[in-house]
């Protein structure tokens, strides 16, 4: 998986999951992308990443918990691994979801919480913290939305896809 980011200079960047970590490239000119840095990680065919502010958060089915990457110097060609955040036995994750409106990321298909939805606070972006979980069913993928109007105004709702078991809606976090 991959996500885009814009540096302070206005140049465009992509952060992409690779077999052994995450690659970062400048894509300001999409016909001439330039690899600028990479962050090593576990060997896995499945790496997922989300960008929130000046940080990228990577997960993998190979382990390492949440890889926290500082993108503040990306314009200078540097991406720094802040930490491999592990908590409560968390190591592997299938998917990571972000909600920029709330400042939370969510883990799906992790090795803890029965593979359910895990809420992670980014109050301190360099040190994400697990603050809740829904472990009734495995969650393969999700979309989390903060409603601004209507009957759900001010609420963060998670649409959780449980594979062949259907779709479940949750109040989050």
Which role does the model predict for each range below?
Residues 1-173:
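Feature marking well-ordered beta-strand scaffolds used for ligand recognition
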């Amino acid at each position: 998986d991959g996500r885009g980011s814009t540096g302070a200079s206005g140049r465009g960047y992509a952060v992409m999951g690779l077999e052994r970590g995450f690659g970062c490239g400048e894509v300001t000119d999409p016909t001439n992308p330039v690899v600028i840095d990479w962050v090593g990680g576990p060997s896995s065919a499945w790496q997922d990443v989300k960008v929130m502010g000046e940080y990228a958060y990577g997960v993998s089915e190979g382990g390492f918990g949440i890889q926290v990457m500082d993108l503040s110097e990306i314009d200078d060609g540097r991406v720094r691994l802040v930490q491999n955040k592990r908590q409560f036995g968390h190591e592997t994750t299938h998917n990571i979801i972000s909600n920029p409106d709330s400042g939370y990321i969510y883990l799906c298909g992790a090795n803890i919480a029965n593979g359910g939805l895990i809420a992670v606070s980014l109050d301190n972006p360099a040190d994400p913290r697990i603050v809740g979980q829904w472990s009734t069913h495995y969650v393969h993928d999700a979309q989390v939305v903060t409603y601004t109007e209507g009957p759900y105004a001010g609420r963060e709702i998670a649409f959780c896809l449980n594979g062949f078991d259907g779709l479940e809606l949750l109040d989050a976090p």
